[in-house]
């Protein structure tokens, strides 16, 4: 069974096995697709989607009644175990990525979602709020002006929760995709060794590589086009927490990790860090990373050695990387 990833878009191909069952629900402002390749009662999907909706009620930044919106508005306070645990996981990833992934950069991200390009003073003020967050028992402590934005990371958390629900229901072969950029492959489709996904780069007509997933999470993060000023249209979801400015690059990252949430964090970090981002990510145990540019694909040492991401014949290798023909 193969799947297609198009600049962060995940689609089942026509070659997907007919015996697999797929359900798609709209959650967290995007689509959660679950494909099960086990003989299973349709009820196995219910637990998965229920967990995703519960997470949406916690992490949505659009629902004024979500726990996250209310916490940000209050400047911190008592928080549910789910929110505290997820924040602790995100804070650990912030340390592991040297601050290139940071859910406390909500003020900076929100600034670049506005229609007008912010002033340098606005950016500096928002940047000063990043990282001013802590856990104190059952409370989340936020500095003045600091807001949390879990965004894609929450989708990774939802994928992992969905996988847990499927396992509890006895499912061993499934592919979970959320927002068409965060995913997890459970086992492998019958008759195959892994879930296979085709990855396209900035040119939607060119399939760059093939990703193989088996009992691993993955994330695809992309920032193609733009000049770094029109963040609202093209870069608002990828802002460098250190500088407070959106990325102005033409690249995508592919990261494989033990969980989808970890993959989400490191996928953003690879892009934000730029040169050396792939190698830095792979310093962490269990992380495989790659970076796709307009003219080359950089494979991390571990990604290359395991064959998890295989560059297709239509591209050629150049000095440890891969140059597109």
Task: Name each model feature, range by range.
Residues 2-325:
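Mature catalytic core of soluble alpha/beta enzymes
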């Amino acid at each position: 069974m193969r799947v297609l990833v198009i600049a962060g878009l995940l689609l089942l191909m026509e070659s997907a096995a007919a015996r697999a069952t797929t359900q798609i629900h709209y959650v967290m402002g995007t689509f959660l697709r679950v494909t099960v390749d086990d003989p299973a009662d349709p009820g196995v999907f219910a637990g998965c989607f229920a967990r995703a909706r519960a997470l949406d009620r916690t992490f949505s930044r659009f629902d004024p009644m979500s726990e996250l919106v209310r916490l940000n508005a209050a400047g911190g306070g008592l928080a549910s175990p789910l929110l505290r645990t997820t924040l602790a996981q995100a804070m650990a990833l912030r340390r592991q990525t040297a601050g290139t992934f940071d859910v406390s950069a909500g003020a900076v991200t929100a600034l670049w979602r506005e229609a007008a390009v912010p002033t340098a003073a606005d950016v500096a003020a928002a940047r000063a709020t990043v990282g001013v967050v802590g856990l104190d028992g059952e409370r989340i402590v936020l500095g003045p002006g600091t807001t949390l934005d879990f965004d894609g990371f929450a989708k990774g958390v939802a994928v992992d929760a969905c996988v847990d629900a499927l396992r509890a229901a006895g499912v061993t072969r499934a592919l979970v995709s959320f927002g068409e950029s965060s995913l997890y492959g459970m086992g492998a489709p019958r008759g195959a060794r892994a879930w296979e996904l085709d990855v396209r780069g900035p040119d939607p007509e060119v399939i760059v590589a093939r990703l193989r997933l088996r009992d691993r999470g993955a994330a695809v993060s992309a920032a193609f086009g733009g000049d770094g000023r029109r963040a609202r249209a093209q870069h608002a979801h990828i802002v460098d927490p250190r500088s407070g400015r959106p990325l102005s690059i033409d690249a995508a990252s592919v990261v494989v990790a033990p969980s989808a949430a970890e993959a989400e964090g490191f996928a953003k970090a690879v892009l934000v860090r730029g040169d050396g981002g792939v190698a830095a990510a792979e310093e962490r145990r269990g992380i495989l990373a790659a970076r796709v540019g307009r003219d080359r694909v950089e494979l991390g040492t571990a990604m290359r050695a395991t064959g998890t991401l295989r560059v297709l014949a239509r591209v050629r290798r150049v000095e440890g990387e891969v140059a597109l023909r």
